[in-house]
Amino acid sequence: IKTGMLATVAIIERVADELAAHSTGVPLVVDPVMISKSGYELLDPDAVATLRTRLLPQATVITPNLHEAGHLLKSTVRTEADMRDAARALHDMGPEAVLVKGGHLAATDDAVDILFDGTTFHAVRAPRIDTPHTHGTGCTYASAIAAHLAHGRPLPEAVQHAKAYVTGAIDAALAIGSGHGPTNHFFHCTPFTESVAASADAA
C-alpha cells in the first residue's frame, strides 16, 4: 500500500482507521506530500500534526524529501549529515524505517538518499541528472518502493531497485510543453524512436 497527498485531518484519520483495521502485515509506504515544488504548503498545521500521530506510526517506510522532513520536524535539512539526523528523529515518531530523499541537496554530483531502519543507515546514491523535467519523481519513487515490497523484497533492496528505476525514468524524461515535464515511467518498455517535439510537429 502506498499513500500520497492526504489533504485534511478527516481524510488522514479515515485512511489511518482503515489501515489499522484491514492492512495488518501489509507493507505501507507513506509519501508525506505536503509542499509543492514552488514551496506552497499544501496541508494546514492540524493535518500535518495528524499525519505525524496517526499515519507515520503505521508505516513500513516514510519517504520525505528535504523540505517535507524539515516541515515534519519543524527544522531545516540542508546537508547529508542533517539528513541522517532527520531520519533518526523521524524514526522516533514510529515508522519502521525512514527514507530521506536528497534530490534537493545543493551542489552535489550525485543524488543521495538516506535510509534508516532504527539501527543502520544506508546511503542510496545515483548520478544526478541535470534536467528540469522531474515532475512526479517523488510519487514515482515511493510507488516503485511499494511495488518491490509487494514482490517480497527486503526494504533496502526495494529502495535500491526503486532508485535505479526512478533514475532511469528521469534520464528519459519527456520534454512536454514549456514547464517541468514528467518522468518517463515506460522508458524500459517502449523506447521512443523520435523526439516528442518531432512527433508533435508531425501531428
Model-based region annotation:
Residues K2-P57:
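Glycine/small-residue-rich loop that forms an oxyanion/phosphate-binding "nest" at active or ligand-binding sites
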Residues K2-T3, V29-K37, T63-L72, V100, ...:
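Short beta-strands and strand-loop turn motifs
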Residues A10, R14-A21, P27, V112-L115, ...:
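Nucleotide and nucleotide-moiety/phosphate-recognizing core
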Residues P45-F121:
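Conserved phosphate/ATP/ADP-binding segment of small-molecule kinases
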Residues H71, P132-L155:
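Short, small-residue alpha-helix embedded
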Residues S75-M83, A150-Q160:
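Short, charged, surface-exposed loops that flank catalytic or proteolytic processing sites
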Residues F121-H135:
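Short pre-catalytic strand/loop immediately N-terminal to key active-site residues, enriched for Gly-Thr
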Residues P156-A203:
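Charged C-terminal helix
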